[in-house]
From Swiss-Prot:
A Pfam family reported for this protein in Swiss-Prot or TrEMBL: GTP_EFTU
Entry annotated with the keyword Nucleotide-binding: yes
Species of origin: Stenotrophomonas maltophilia (strain K279a)
Residues in tr-type G domain copies: 8-290
Residue numbers binding GTP: 17-24, 88-92, 142-145
Protein name per its UniProtKB record: Elongation factor G
Higher taxonomy: Bacteria, Pseudomonadati, Pseudomonadota, Gammaproteobacteria, Lysobacterales
């Protein structure tokens, strides 16, 4: 099938913003003006077309990123028809995984900012993510109709807080209740949108006299910025020649694609003003799939060999699965971005990460929550496949005869965990299946069974993330669940070496008795033990057993029972029932009885000898220490460091981010002090800081902490 839209006229872009900047409303207006959505959905009524999960509509925040295809010929229908693949991304810090994964497959972005709040906390996080993936972007300053709206203030903040070169393409005519339209600095005309047609119609007019001077100054800055794109243009500009409109657009486009500048538009999505002109900016300034560097990958058999794929229908097929959604009607939907080649429904492709072939059933093009079945997808397309069995987020799907593994997405480790159990026994199996499916959809959500407590532990990116998971269990899978406070995985060990313990288990009361006698020595495992080629392989589960029996004082057949008794005892330590680690036990002496000795008797004797010896060897409780990295604007650095110290954290040093916009604080903090940290850090820094943490090591817990844990235990 021939291409209906040349690839140069594709625009794959995301709509990014801080929570409440009006991103979903902006997306809705895009769908309305591009003719895809006949009735505008309002977030205020919980009816937005793009927010398609019930919870999103209730909470008024966007959780899942919905991919939508739309078409645009320009506000005045003067441009050739372009195909938009739009991804709406969430702005809440608990869902940064959604933003990351959509950025990975996009070519450009529209950054929505609030004209009142300006560069808000989450804007900085999202901006840093966009920098990481080198995503060219334009900005839309929304809510110009709101009290306190100030376009110039936001332009200044982009420079001050984000280090961006903001280039206004428009100026607002009025603000707050008096916001009437915009001045187009390219055409040097005023634009007013017609309210009766919900902004579908508009008219050009002369710039209001009181804005003429400001418009000329802003245009001069815009033209100067464009001229810096090449020496040729700069010479022309400095020589006093006028630059043509097409030259200015092309030059600004070059600089936007190089992420050197951020062109700025303004309006009020709610009042149907400005979104239309911003869409023209998407066509004029954001990249097509052929404007971005070829996608990188590696050879399936040798990951040191780099490969690339061109955005071309004739190249071998390659695509990245970037999201999986469980759909109530068709099951698992795998969203994928095609980087090269073509794919037809019914084709077999290779999942090169898993080394498995997958048959593509139906291919669906998504419009928010509605879908249309299509026969094929081409380079640059974003679509969803039905019926893939082994594909998870971040996997590459490619031609069987031309394998490649595309650069994978990195997902942060979960930072908060809690125990969850079904309210009724009958829901146990259902809950297991449901959690498995949710974990497949969302790589930042993990499920595991705690071997020590038998509890199901769910882990995610924050309290809200896990709240929504529990909520989805109820809504989508009808599983009612109770959630508990998470437990810290403490451990127990000893600090004294060569502690002797002698225990005799003897019961002789007529008939066959029981007799087992062991003498053991307890010591901590040393670095030398771990380096010893003979001993190191025998260290299992951080426990080392050494049989030093000579002369047959304990027959050989009972030695395994002695070890078994010890290994069973260390799974639940004598202090507070946590696993024992880093202990070496040497069996040095004992005795036996010809008739009454048995495996069970020696197992009991070794277990009791261990418990008694452990108590004498100065036992300590160990707590997990997490390596924490916090990225925070400098204004909050003192508060954040103070809080780290209050949490018994040890600062390891600090640094600044590459662009100098934020501080990076590294610290070691006990896990027990980290619960609720995501929420605390958010309120401390107005949501502007982010953190990651990973397990680093265990170390002895302070006496007061150990006593509190043992009381509980």
């Amino acid at each position: 099938m021939a291409r209906s839209t040349p690839i140069e006229r594709y625009r794959n872009f995301g709509i990014m913003a801080h929570i409440d900047a009006g991103k979903t409303t902006t997306s809705e207006r895009i769908l309305f003006y591009t003719g895809k959505s006949h009735k505008i959905g309002e977030v205020h009524d919980g009816a937005a077309t793009m927010d398609w999960m019930e919870q999103e509509q209730e909470r008024g925040i966007t959780i899942q990123s919905a991919a939508t295809t739309a078409f645009w010929k320009g506000m005045d229908k003067s441009l050739p028809e372009h195909r938009f693949n739009i991804i709406d991304t969430p702005g809440h810090v608990d869902f940064t995984i959604e933003v990351e994964r959509s950025l990975r497959v996009l070519d450009g972005a529209v950054f929505v900012l609030c004209a009142v709040g300006g560069v808000q906390p989450q804007s900085e996080t999202v901006w840093r993510q966009a920098n990481k993936y080198h995503v060219p972007r334009i900005a839309f300053v929304n809510k110009m109709d709101r009290t306190g709206a100030n376009f110039q203030k936001v332009v200044g903040q982009l420079k001050a807080k984000l280090g961006a070169v903001a280039v206004p393409m428009q100026l607002p005519i009025g603000a707050e209740d008096n916001f009437k339209g915009v001045v187009d600095l390219l055409k040097m005309k005023a634009i007013h949108w017609d309210e009766a047609s919900q902004g579908m119609k508009f008219e050009y007019s002369d710039i209001p006299a009181d804005l003429q001077a400001a418009a000329e100054e802003a245009r001069q800055f815009m033209v100067e910025t464009a001229a810096e794109a090449s020496e040729e243009l700069m010479e022309k500009y400095l020589g006093g020649e006028e630059l043509a409109e097409a030259e200015i657009i092309n030059a600004l486009r070059t600089r936007t694609l190089a992420t050197e500048i951020v062109p700025m538009y303004c309006g009020s999505a709610f009042k149907n003003k400005g979104v239309q002109a911003m869409l023209d900016g998407v066509i004029q300034l954001l990249p097509s799939p052929v404007d971005v560097p070829d996608v990188k990958g590696v050879d399936v058999d040798d990951d040191t060999v780099e490969m690339t794929r061109k955005s071309d229908d004739k190249a071998p097929f390659s695509s990245l699965a970037f999201k999986i959604i469980t759909d109530p009607f068709v099951g698992a939907l795998t969203f994928f971005r095609v980087y090269s080649g073509t794919l037809n429904g019914g084709d077999t492709v290779l999942n090169s990460v898993k080394g498995k072939k997958e048959r593509i059933g139906r291919i669906l093009q998504m419009h928010s929550n509605n879908r249309e079945e299509i026969k094929e997808v081409l380079a640059g397309d974003i679509a969803a496949a039905v019926g893939l069995k082994d594909t998870t987020t971040g996997d590459t799907l490619c031609a069987v005869d031309a394998p490649i593994i595309l650069e994978r997405m990195t997902f942060p480790e979960p930072v908060i965990s809690m125990a969850v159990e079904p309210k009724t026994k009958s829901d146990q199996e259902k809950m297991g299946l449901a959690l498995g499916r949710l974990a497949q959809e969302d790589p930042s959500f993990r499920v595991k069974t705690d071997e020590e407590s038998g509890q199901t532990i769910i882990s995610g990116m924050g309290e809200l993330h896990l709240d929504i998971i529990v909520d989805r269990l109820k809504r989508e899978f009808n599983v009612e669940a109770n959630v508990g406070a998470p437990q810290v995985a403490y451990r127990e060990t000893i600090t004294l070496a060569d502690v002797k313990s002698d225990y005799k288990h003897a019961k002789q009361s007529g008939g066959k008795g029981q007799y087992g006698h062991v003498v053991i020595e307890l010591s901590p495992i040393t670095a030398a033990d771990r380096a010893d080629p003979k001993l190191a392989p025998a260290i299992k589960d951080d426990f080392l057993f050494i049989n030093d029996i000579t002369g047959g004082v304990i027959p050989k057949e009972f030695i395994p029972s002695v070890e078994k008794g010890l290994r069973e005892t260390i799974t639940s330590g004598p202090l507070a029932g946590f696993p024992v680690v880093d202990v070496k036990v040497k069996l040095v002496f004992g005795s036996y009885h010809d008739v009454d000795s048995s495996e069970m008797a020696f197992k009991l004797a070794s277990s009791m000898a261990f418990k008694q010896g452990f108590a004498k060897a100065k036992p300590v409780l160990l707590e997990p220490i997490m390596k924490v990295e916090i990225v925070t604007p400098e204004d909050y650095q003192g508060d954040v460091m103070g809080d780290v110290s209050r949490r018994r954290g040890v600062l390891q040093g600090s640094d600044t981010t590459g662009d100098g916009s934020a501080s990076i604080i590294n610290a070691m903090i006990p896990l027990g002090e980290m619960f609720g940290y995501a929420t605390a850090l958010r309120s401390q820094t107005q949501g502007r800081a982010t953190f990651t943490m990973e397990f680093d090591h265990y170390e002895p817990a302070p006496t007061n902490i150990a006593e509190a844990v043992m009381k509980k235990g």
